[in-house]
């Protein structure tokens, strides 16, 4: 349980698990604002090295002395309770010393408190949409602060302390902590059951988004994707309640026609996929502005990415950024690390990596891959999938199988358990048994790359998919492929 004062004293902040995607971003902003930052993590990493270079003191390993062994005690200890157990020695030391322990979301809320917050929430697509919003608002000549769950390819960072009045952030619903925020603009990309290990029921998971909608500031906007049944239903419920905030929708023409009672701020009239991504014609009808049609481009393949781009553009424009400049910025967006990230080509085989770890995300990335294959007259799609969490694998085995069956061939790795202990009788084969395409189960991680190169042919597209260590295989597959070619 957190012990949060009314106002958090961030002057000497200690962060447990400082190298994680969310924690490292907050640390970067704290350092840029002049606060003293210490922290710990289980191993060195690129983010830990970067934080040290920026002025943070980071210890490897968790030890009570990291909290109480310095000349001065920290004024606050920050953690992610989803990732760090309550009996962690640093948390125990903080409790015994009377140091407040808060969640990372509480600190992020404090950092946003003097800014106009633009938050991106939803089961899927948060990182990509947040990233596009950042590059779009930056292209409009503004300098927003931002905190993202992934690393912007071009900027090489996941966070920034800006001079402007806007703060753009990804709002993580996994443990309900996004209820700490008070956004002026909140985008909901989609809502469907996930994180049932925390919420218990689908109803509880959906209900947390209704509560999040109440956090939008007076005069603010809740912007929901009309193509997603869950997000559209939320928009309808909030409108029916007749209370703040103003509810707007975005999405395809077909979806807008299905929801005529939800004012559409942006309607995609046409989407044209090609080898460079997707071009689209969009009708914007933003409050206080004349209706206008604009051509947009999103360089990352997939209809889901086009929807994310439209969401980012709409939110930026609602905060006063110049619409045409935001559109130009999004067109120039070159992706986020581990979101349909191109790693290279070996022997005519192209290798991509993606963080997808929910059936809907897997469906989206494989659909995007099929669009890419069709646009470039390429060969087959080979998916290398590592399930994430035993509970998620059990709950969604059939859904994962349907999604992965979009590939021509699948290599299944062992489950990446993360915070969970193994469950007897549960491994990746419960997905494989339901696949309708050719598949292989490879429990030996060190043998995967060689097996994939043995399967792949020139023209094929290989996708490494999952939230765990599978990302390490993208470059290893390329290395094996080049060795096989004698390169």
From Swiss-Prot:
Where is this chain's protein located in or outside the cell? Cytoplasm
What GO cellular component term, any one, is given? cytoplasm
Q: What's a single GO BP term from this record?
A: regulation of cell shape
Name the SUPFAM superfamilies for this protein. MurCD N-terminal domain (SSF51984), MurD-like peptide ligases, catalytic domain (SSF53623), MurD-like peptide ligases, peptide-binding domain (SSF53244)
InterPro entries assigned to the protein according to its UniProt record, in alphabetical order: Mur-like_cat_sf (IPR036565), Mur_ligase_C (IPR004101), Mur_ligase_C_dom_sf (IPR036615), Mur_ligase_cen (IPR013221), Mur_ligase_N (IPR000713), MurCDEF_pg_biosynth (IPR050061), UDP-N-AcMur_Ala_ligase_MurC (IPR005758)
For the ligand (ATP), the binding residues are 122-128
Pathway annotation from the record: Cell wall biogenesis; peptidoglycan biosynthesis
One GO molecular-function entry: ATP binding
Q: What is this enzyme's EC?
A: 6.3.2.8
Predominant subcellular localization, coarse grouping: cytoplasm
Name the enzyme's class.
Answer: ligase
Q: Which family does it belong to?
A: Belongs to the MurCDEF family.
Note the HAMAP family from the entry.
MurC (MF_00046)
Q: What does this protein do?
A: Cell wall formation.
Protein name per its UniProtKB record:
UDP-N-acetylmuramate--L-alanine ligase
Q: Organism, per UniProt? A: Corynebacterium urealyticum (strain ATCC 43042 / DSM 7109)
- Organism phylogeny: Bacteria, Bacillati, Actinomycetota, Actinomycetes, Mycobacteriales
Gene name, per UniProt, is murC
